[in-house]
Amino acid sequence: MQVNNTNETKQRRLLIENAAQILTMRGESNHDVGMVENGWLYIEGDRIKAVGSQEEVERAAGDLEGVERLDAAGKVITPGFVDCHTHVVFGGSRVAEYAVKLTDPRPETLKKLGIPTGIYASVNMTRDTSVERLAARTERRMRNMLVTGTTTIESKSGYGFTLPAEMKMLEVNRLLSATLPMDIVPTFLGAHGWAEGKSKEWYIDQLCQEMIPQVAAFHMASFNDVWVDEGNYTSAEAERILTCGVDHGLIPSIHADCYSDIGATALAAQMKMANAGHLNYTPLSVMPKLRDAGVVGVILPGTDFAVKHPHVANARPMLDCGMTMALATNCNPGCWMESMQVVLTLACRQNGFSPAEAFRAATYGGARALTLDDRGVLDVDKVADLLILDVETFEDVIYKFGRNHVQTVIKKGKVVARDGRILESEPS
């Protein structure tokens, strides 16, 4: 992940005044956003040093001479969004497939028209894209994510199915971590499918004997992910792949129950995985097990919308049973969504979240899904990743949908974007 200049952050002091609302996320439950009204917030370097009333913050800050000040009067402050499930590194576009499917989703129609579809279409386009071009196109997407409020993003491989192609995708994450003012958490998703013309058994051997050891040896990923579903990997196969990852120091996560329940979430609970994503067909009986195992449930409203899912994920019973929940864009060629603000709106309209629960899932929950306890909450000594939203109340982001409500993005104590623009030279 990107590391800011230490000397610069030590010298920086920032006081944000007069916010109508500060959502600290210091609460204990899914619906508690830790609201502070008429709030102030003080930052030293890259860390928050005080949050609360004017009197509390000024007392904690001490001498304020020379401190940079931002007036947030009538505005809302929240933690930066943590987009904890994306496939943002990819080549090409599947717009032709998407456009046809809007009115005629039959596979035979797409085949007759000669339109490549699905993951394997993206695999071929990504393989054919140079690392430089792949980085440039991904950077454009990540910049859009940053100005709409995402300060930490998880980014998966999974459109390669060979070691060089998967490593190329992970190298893009490394390159962009050095140039963008956001943290990129890399995930190895070699088990997104398997190489065409090869058996699944052969490919699993390649994953465990060559690909995972190499990814780990070169420190290219923090997480190891598998897509478990009918027609893809079984729970037993996923257990082997994820256990191999654990043996090489990679944290397990899983694509679970998107189109069927074949034991993926039960495995997530058994292995105490960091997170499980999709959850469209997760049985009620497994939800308490996920909660007790500390598995964060990741709901992907954009995907449910983009594919017109026949069984939209219902987060309500998960929230009610006390699972920690997260929201993410799942940005990918089949769900090209870059804004977490749109995710918030969809989550509340179609997936059973209240506005408070959605904001908490998009910040605190996303950080927990990535095992990051230093962000997603505005509290003393936490990383100063936060947003100033040009709204009177946080619910307005969900209510007044369709535009960017982020006025200011602060990353590690530094203003990095304002009014839809990153405060540095734009890419050529």
Show which residues each predicted segment covers:
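Divalent metal-coordination and catalytic microenvironments
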Residues: 19, 41, 46, 74, ...
